[in-house]
């Protein structure tokens, strides 16, 4: 019985431990960089709440997946809330059928770098850069309504 249970364990060709099933995890690093002149408060539903990003700073969140790096779509599936300067401007964003600029739920609004760690662990870095154009777009949408 023990031989059957251990059959999936082992090392890869380089002698690195591959774990129980032989598949390494995948990692994603999500980075939201604030290059605007405004303080941003950000919430990603079911991930984190009300994290502040000051001008010139970044917020980093790491997510571990099974075999492949977690996707942006999976990470933000329940939406994201952005508030500028604790004021009325910002928004609650979701993925929709229509791709939108200044929506942090769409991959096309990110810089994406894919690589491998130690040659076999999938790694993906997702970077969204907030600029004053994000704030201007929020002002153009008008004040947020009470949720």
Q: PLM features: what roles do these ranges have?
A:
Residues 10-31, 39-68, 72-147:
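Intrinsically disordered, low-complexity segments enriched in small/polar residues
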Residues 5-8:
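C-terminal motif of bacterial Sec signal peptides marking the signal peptidase cleavage site
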């Amino acid at each position: 019985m023990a031989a059957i249970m251990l059959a999936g364990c082992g090392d890869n060709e380089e002698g690195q431990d591959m774990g129980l099933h032989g598949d390494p995890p995948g990692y994603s690093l999500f980075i939201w960089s604030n290059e605007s002149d405004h303080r941003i408060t950000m919430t990603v539903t079911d991930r984190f709440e009300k994290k502040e990003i000051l001008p010139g700073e970044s917020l980093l969140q790491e997510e571990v997946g099974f075999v492949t790096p977690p996707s942006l779509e999976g990470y933000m599936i329940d939406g994201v809330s952005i508030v500028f300067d604790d004021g009325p401007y910002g928004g609650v964003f979701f993925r929709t059928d229509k791709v939108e600029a200044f929506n942090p739920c769409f991959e096309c609004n990110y810089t994406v770098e894919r690589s491998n760690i130690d040659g076999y662990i999938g790694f993906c870095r997702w970077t969204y850069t907030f600029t004053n154009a994000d704030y201007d777009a929020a002002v153009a949408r008008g004040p947020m309504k009470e949720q």
